[in-house]
Amino acid sequence: MMEIDKIKVTIETYNNIVEEYVDYYKSKDLKGNVQFQKEIDYLISQLNKNAMILDAGTAIGDYPKFLTEKCDKNFNVIGIDTSENMLRKAIKNAPKAKFKLMDIRNITFDKDNFDAIICFATLIHVDDKTCLRVLDKFSELLKDKGIIAINVMECNNEEKEIFIPEPFNPKYKTYFNRYSKQFFSDYFTANNYTIEKIYDNKMFDESALGENLVGTNEFTIIARKSKF
């Protein structure tokens, strides 16, 4: 029997749940979220005006919207995603940003192109080996002294990898991978980054997660690329 391509299935899921996704997140004000505000304020404080920022796994473009409309640094933001339906929403949601249909596993931008890369709730949909390849690509894309911000689900005592009915619509299935802080700390230390911040997060609303994800925490790690 042919093995299921869990990542491909997950991409198809996101194409099919865009309305449920929008309905959920439109009630979640990013600016009103204290933890988000702390993280994004730090990121903004570390960037100069006109900085080039990549949002890898942008979904409906909430982060590009915030970065292009809610601060006065005239950032140039590009959001990428594999879901065409999500990107259609993103283009309307954040008209000051640019968007491209692109897989984080096959990014085609030039090297040393970005001052910052943010990747929130996206690496949770790839396995560890793929994640490391993506991080290597991010390293190529970042300028020296560039900032990277990664947000993922944390693995404590839970099952690390799960392939479950999608919490927003159980008609579909989604692959999740949870990570330890050590996984990213080891990578960044070995690849000439300085870890600047690690934030422990709670999910927006555990009641929306389904029984397989209740109790799962998140963390955000922010690191700076050093010169080789």
Residue spans for each PLM region:
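Conserved class I S-adenosyl-L-methionine
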Residues: M2-L47
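Class I SAM-dependent methyltransferase SAM/SAH-binding core
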Residues: L54-N106
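A conserved beta-strand element that flanks and buttresses the S-adenosyl-L-methionine
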Residues: I118-C119
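A short glycine-rich, Lys/Arg-flanked "PGG" loop and its adjoining helix->strand segment in the class I
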Residues: L132-D144
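Conserved beta-strand signature within the Rossmann-like core of class I S-adenosyl-L-methionine
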Residues: G146-V152
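Acceptor-substrate binding/catalytic loop of class I
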Residues: P165-F183
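Conserved S-adenosyl-L-methionine
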Residues: Y193-F204
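Core SAM-dependent methyltransferase catalytic element
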Residues: E206-F228
